[in-house]
UniProtKB/Swiss-Prot annotation:
This is Contactin-associated protein like 5-2. It is a single-pass type I membrane protein. It comes from Mus musculus. The gene is Cntnap5b. May play a role in the correct development and proper functioning of the peripheral and central nervous system and be involved in cell adhesion and intercellular communication. Expressed in brain. One of its GO terms (biological process) is cell adhesion. Residues 25-1224 are extracellular. Pfam families: F5_F8_type_C, Laminin_G_2. Residues 1246-1292 are cytoplasmic. The lineage of its organism: Eukaryota, Metazoa, Chordata, Craniata, Vertebrata. Disulfide bonds join 30-174, 329-360, 512-544, 550-561, 555-570, 572-582, 916-943, 947-960, 954-969, 971-981, 1150-1185.
Length: 1292
């Protein structure tokens, strides 16, 4: 972020703070008792004992000593009329004097008119006040947010179970000054400037408003150059349009700069504050603030002539407006410190008002709320047998389905139903015979807006009108005469109704209704409340308690919010996040974590801050055996040539990495090392000037600062790395790595000296490359129960997620604890098999428990994730089933903590944790535990013993090696490689390929000569043998592996002519042991695995999934091993005749994962041929056996060795196109000369090649298999059985 927005943001915040301080300073002593001096008539109630409400003042002892209703039940209330609108800052209560009657909890509602009540809330929750525990003590509550009202009601929720409801009350506050203007929807106020144009660099506009209409302009101003500012109600929300000096933008074609609020057409006061400094602006509606940057080219707002309030009048056309005017009341309207309404009341010349009055007219509207989807209903009487029927009302809801109206027509002739189904109105009329008709109208009527419904019927014609639409359809009912009935059920039906007076084919309605008319007569809902009209169940009368659960939007990371009356839901599709509120990232935080989960190389999305605000970024993870590299590409990694630039017009290239600078900084800061390769070529072009002069080329990094140093050197010096080391090979080339993390990544390169004759330069900036996760292995050890780490307070009001690894041998201990005044959070291991997550957000303590079937104090790493949001609380331990608890639909939901976060202990220094904790995340933020442990007694940085937990990740004989940060897998004694020894090493063998491993010296198979397990001595006869190999071939018979013992004894693994596996042991001249595995033909171009192990005389053979066992005779003596051969045995002297048959064509196919005891001969040949006792003859090509399974096997029949420049023509194929002419002689001469020339060249190449690699006879190639591979796969040679020496054969 540049410095200007930072400065303007600070100024905006300062201005906002001063503004609010000014407002609160006027009410500094607003705590006077307001009820003590009220007359008895100011007190009223839902019901009372004789005159009890008039003696309900605090500390009052007269009369009955306080208020008690006739019966203690729900929906009772005590009301105070404070005479005028006042500011209420506190309340206090007592029980009824000298009794056992008191209220233990209650809520407050307030109103300006005594109707259309509003519930007192904190945040988005209806606030419950703690009441009394006896009759005489006073319980005082300071309101977190002051309210302004004339009427206030105390509504008891719970009371003494051994008594009744009893209350004495007091209200504290002060006088409230208010300037009000009433707009009738056809008028406006004009504030005219003293000069033509009002130009402002900063603005503060504040007001309050109330309205029953969802649309209307509150204020507007514009200038001739495109400046404009407009605040407009749109569907019950406030849209702000603000533009600075952009003539292209027009109000009708631009989108709002900000939209805030919801359900603002509820006839309650709503506050608005707009603060602007330059292009930075804060827009606040009812304590919800949105910060934004304005459109436009300048910092000044230029408004011409006037500002209009309440509408946008058309110049020279009085009474004409561009948009719908505002209808309602505006209070305390200030524009840059000017009280606009006060000026209008005093008829100042700057103000023009048309039909604006200065008192707020309050419509006497009584809304009702249907609370319960099963039991809410309202019964109102009709006038029976009137010719026709007329019903109208307004409703608003979030539910798609619900019964709106059910009535039985006069004399039981039929039924009329009005249903909301799938957000559409459905009118259904049936007669007693079952004939019916229906009408559908509207869609998405569950959008929370007020909708008006009017049903008019006369005789055989019914009309349903929605939202005053004149094009509403009419229904004809020739089979039914419609007459008004006795009863009208709104919202639902009573449970005890047994006849057809009320039918409900769908669930009850949840929502609000108002303005109910039956037979063109309004219904008095206050009379319903008092019990003198109709009947009801589970209604809130005289208030609409609709709540927009999607505002503010608690779906994080762009999740889409939908809602019903009681709940909201988040659609997290295409966000990269999951969970009830789209809080949890589906991606890992680094390549290290992907590696830990078993991934190797590929493109991955990395979310550096987890559940934090930063979006995931795509990177390339390359997991090698020693480092895990993370690569981020940018938009120009190719070599780029530059000409024609100079200091006045330099060449500039901006680099785009596909993410924000915040994302890149998080990746870099979380890595151990980062680098970018920089290459610069030049000709007649300077890179640097003098060591102190201005450079001709430079680059900028993350903070937009110039950096004149280049690859391999240090920040601050105009040098390059090879110049420092005096190793520059070319004067015109500078190549090196930038590795100072605070300056990376390179975001821009500037070159300014390529405009001279024949002058040019070229540059290349490589991708950003990093390795090492600084946090994943960040661990601490707690050695005493009293030790803990201090972390700043965990601020997680709406969402909290905590994750970490731990290991311990203790029986119990507290991992984390954070306290608040009333709230707390604690995570602990309560026993060796139980983890508890305890939390209290104000609704009482709640505990989640996960029980483990295995002990958690086994000194192994275990993972814990605890999460709490406003919808649910969850606890995960390892991969065990999670524990979950849904949040209450109503009640407190803000987690407010104020103490420090204790890690590894508690504030009481008891029940501390003994063991290790690592990789602690708090709402995605990484906590550097090791750094804090350095200055904390009883806590030690780091934790050893990673291999105890993760050693199992090293597979196929790999050995886990402990490191300070994490671990590595040593694959020395494994035929596999890779970070987890999971990558097989395989190669293609041709008919002449032979790999021989000699057991003569204790040669290691890797460069690590200290590993003695990698060799076998020639004079040692192994008591145990283990052989593993995988193969794929289409040739049979063929030899797979040959072990040469002393005295012409051997072990051979081969495929017989029918493709079955055969293992031959020859341990003496007199006797051989032959084991034949009678399975299907294994020469079927599929990968098969052979495992053979011998322990003394016990032999086991596994072919794929089949296992066989055998015992050698006790007199058998096993021989020492001299060599191991894969493929063709080239020294055939003394070779067993049957083995010789299989060896005739060698092995053509693929071998992989070959291992004899701790020897991996194929790995030695392909990876460590220069230091291993291995010899390769013929062509050996590294490849993957699995990739060959479905390959095309119809290739060319000839395979060439790379050491021979020409292949031989197949002897069985005749030559063609032979020319019989006199030119044959000339051609022959040319051929002979050519042949001799190539022979000489071949001898020279062969000689040089032998000088270079004398230990090998042929070249190995590491490449993909060639297209001509499968020529020999088609060869099938029929070898006759030959009599051999006496053998023991075992057919298994």
């Amino acid at each position: 972020m540049d410095s200007v927005p930072r400065l303007t943001s600070i100024l905006t915040l300062v201005l906002s703070g001063l503004w609010h301080v000014g407002l609160t300073a006027t009410n500094y002593n607003c705590d006077d008792p307001l009820a003590s001096f009220l007359s008895p008539k100011a007190f009223s109630s839902s019901s009372d004992l004789t005159g009890s409400s008039s003696s309900a003042q605090l500390n009052g002892r007269m009369g009955t000593g306080g208020w008690s209703p006739e019966n203690s039940s729900a929906h009772q209330w005590l009301q105070l009329d404070l005479g005028n609108r006042v500011e209420i800052t506190a309340v206090a209560t007592q029980g009824r004097y000298g009794s056992s009657d008191w209220v233990t909890s209650y809520c407050l509602i307030f109103s300006d008119t005594g109707h259309n009540w509003q519930q007192y809330k904190q945040g988005d929750s209806i606030w419950t006040f703690i009441g009394n525990m006896n009759a005489n003590s006073v319980v005082h509550h300071k309101l977190l947010h002051a309210v302004r009202a004339r009427f206030v009601r105390f509504v008891p929720l719970e009371w003494n179970p051994n008594g009744k409801i009893g209350m004495r009350v007091e209200v504290y506050g002060c006088f409230y000054k208010s300037d009000v203007a009433d707009f009738d929807g056809r008028s406006s106020l004009l504030y005219r400037f003293n000069q033509k144009t009002m130009s402002t660099l900063k603005d503060v506009i504040s007001l309050k408003f109330k309205s029953m209409q969802g649309d209307g302009v509150l204020f507007h101003g514009e200038g001739q150059r495109g400046d404009h500012i407009t605040l407009e109600l749109q569907n019950g929300r406030l849209a702000l349009y603000l533009n600075l000096d952009d003539s292209k933008a027009r109000l009708s074609s631009i989108t709002p700069s900000a939209i805030l609020g919801s359900l603002l057409d509820d006839q309650h006061w709503h506050s608005v504050l707009l603060e602007r400094v330059g292009k930075q602006a804060n827009f606040t509606v009812d304590r919800n603030t949105q910060h934004f940057r304005t459109n436009g080219d300048t910092d000044a707002l230029d408004i011409d002539y006037e500002l209009s309030f309440g509408g946008i009048p058309v110049p020279s056309k009085p009474g004409t407006f561009l948009k719908k005017n505002f209808q309602g009341c505006i209070e305390n309207l200030y524009y840059n410190g000017v009280n606009i309404i006060d000026l209008a009341k005093r008829r100042k010349h700057q103000i023009y008002s048309g039909n604006v009055t200065f008192s707020c007219s309050e419509p006497q509207i009584v809304p009702i709320t249907f609370v319960n989807s099963r039991s809410s209903y309202l019964l109102l009487p009709g006038t029976p047998q009137i010719d026709g029927l007329s019903v109208s009302f307004q409703f608003r809801t979030w539910n798609e389905d619900g019964l709106l109206l059910s009535t039985e027509l006069s004399e039981g002739s039929g039924t009329l139903l009005l249903i909301l189904e799938g957000g559409t109105l459905r009118l259904l009329i049936k007669n007693v015979a079952g004939h019916g008709t229906e009408s559908l109208t509207g869609r998405s009527l569950n959008n929370g807006q007020w909708h008006s419904v009017n049903i008019n019927a006369r005789r055989n014609r019914v009309t349903l009108t929605l939202d005053n639409d004149p094009a509403s359809p009419a229904l004809e009912t020739p089979w039914l005469q419609i007459y008004s009935g006795y009863s009208y059920y709104f919202g639902g039906c009573p449970d005890n109704l047994t006849d057809s007076q009320c039918l409900n084919p769908i669930k009850a309605f949840q929502g609000c209704m108002r303005l109910i008319f039956i037979d063109n007569q309004p219904k008095d809902l206050i009379s319903v409340q008092q019990g003198s009209l109709g009947n009801f169940s589970d209604l809130h009368i005289d208030l609409c308690s609709i709540k927009d659960r999607c505002f503010p939007n608690y779906c994080e990371h762009g999740g889409h919010c939908t809602q019903t009356w009681t709940n909201f839901y988040c659609n997290c599709s295409n966000t990269g996040y999951t969970g009830a509120t789209c809080h949890d990232s589906i991606y890992e935080q680094s390549c290290e974590v992907y590696r830990h989960r078993g991934n190797t190389a590929g493109y991955f999305y990395v979310d550096s801050d987890g559940s934090g605000p930063l979006r995931p970024l795509q990177v390339y993870c390359n997991v090698t055996e020693d480092k895990i590299w993370m690569t981020v590409q940018h938009n120009n990694t190719e070599l780029t040539w530059i000409q024609g630039s100079n200091t006045e017009k330099p060449y500039v290239m901006n680099l785009n990495y596909g993410g924000s600078m915040e994302q890149l900084e998080a990746l870099i800061d979380g890595s151990e090392h980062c680098e970018q390769e920089v290459t610069y070529y030049c000709r007649r072009s300077h890179l640097l000037n003098t060591p102190d002069g201005a450079p001709f080329a430079w680059w900028t990094g993350r903070s937009n600062e110039r950096h004149p140093y280049w690859g391999g050197y240090f920040p601050g010096d105009q040098k390059c790395g090879c110049g420092l080391e005096e190793s520059c090979l070319e004067m015109s080339n500078d190549t090196g790595f930038l590795s100072f993390k605070d300056h990376l990544p390179v975001t821009q390169i500037i070159i300014s000296d390529t405009n001279r004759s024949n002058s040019e330069a070229a540059w290349r900036i490589g991708p950003l490359r990093c390795y090492g996760d600084r946090h994943f292995w960040n661990a601490v050890s707690f050695s005493t129960e009293a030790a803990y780490l201090h972390i700043p307070t965990f601020h997680a009001e709406f969402s909290a997620d905590i994750s970490f690894f731990f290991k311990t041998t203790a029986l119990s201990g507290v991992f984390l604890e954070n306290l608040g005044v009333k709230n707390f959070l604690r995570l602990e291991m309560s026993s060796p098999s139980e983890v508890i997550f305890a939390i209290d957000v104000g609704n009482g303590p709640m505990e989640l428990l996960v029980q483990s079937p295995y002990p958690l104090n086994d000194n192994q790493w275990h993972y814990i994730q605890a999460e709490r949001n406003i919808k649910e609380t969850l606890l995960h331990v390892d991969n065990l089933p999670k524990s979950m608890r849904m949040a209450s639909e109503e009640g407190h939901f803000l987690l407010q903590l104020n103490s420090q976060l204790f890690v590894g202990g508690t504030s009481s220094r008891q029940k501390g944790f003994l063991g290790c904790i690592r990789s602690l995340h708090l709402n995605g933020q990484k906590v550097d535990l090791e750094e804090r442990a350095k200055i904390t007694s009883g806590v030690r940085p780091g934790c050893a013993g990673h291999c105890n937990s993760y050693g199992r990740n090293c597979q196929n004989g790999g050995k886990c090696v402990e490191k300070h940060i994490g671990y590595t897998c040593d694959c020395t004694n494994s035929p596999y490689e890779g970070p987890f020894c999971k990558k097989e090493i395989s190669a293609l063998f041709y008919s002449g390929t032979s790999v021989t491993y000699m057991f003569q010296e204790p040669y290691p198979v890797t460069k690590n000569t200290s590993l003695s397990s990698s060799a076998i001595y020639k004079d040692t006869a192994p008591s145990k043998e283990a052989i593993t190999l995988s193969f794929m071939t289409a040739q049979a018979p063929t030899l797979l592996l040959y072990l040469n013992f002393s005295s012409q004894n051997f072990l051979a693994i081969l495929l017989s002519r029918n493709g079955s596996l055969q293992i031959q042991y020859r341990l003496s001249k007199e006797e051989s042991h032959v084991f034949t595995i009678s399975t299907e033909n294994l020469a079927n171009r599929r990968v098969h695995q052979v495992k053979m192990s011998r322990d003394g005389p016990e032999l086991s053979i596994q072919m794929d999934q089949q296992l066989f066992s055998y015992n050698f005779p006790p007199e058998v003596e096993f021989q020492t091993v001299r060599s191991l051969i894969l493929g063709k045995v080239t020294e055939t002297l003394g070779l067993d005749p049957e083995v010789a048959k299989a060896n005739t064509l060698g092995f053509v196919g693929c071998l992989s994962s070959v291992q004899y005891n701790h020897i991996a001969p194929l790995k030695a040949a392909l990876r460590h041929a220069s230091i291993s006792p291995v010899t390769v003859q013929g062509t050996l090509t590294e490849s993957s056996c699995d990739s060959m399974i479905d390959s095309d096997v119809t290739g060319v029949t000839t395979v060439y060795s790379p050491s021979v420049p020409f292949g031989k023509t197949d002897e069985h194929e005749p030559l063609t196109n032979t020319i019989q002419s006199d030119s044959a002689f000339i051609g022959g001469v040319i051929a002979i000369v050519t042949f001799i020339t190539f022979c000489v060249l071949g001898i020279m190449v062969h000689f040089l090649y032998q000088q270079k690699q004398s230990h090998r006879t042929n070249q190995m190639k590491e490449k993909e298999y060639p297209d001509n591979l499968d020529s020999s796969f088609r060869n099938d040679i029929d070898l006759q059985n030959t009599a051999i020496e006496c053998k023991r054969e075992y057919f298994i």
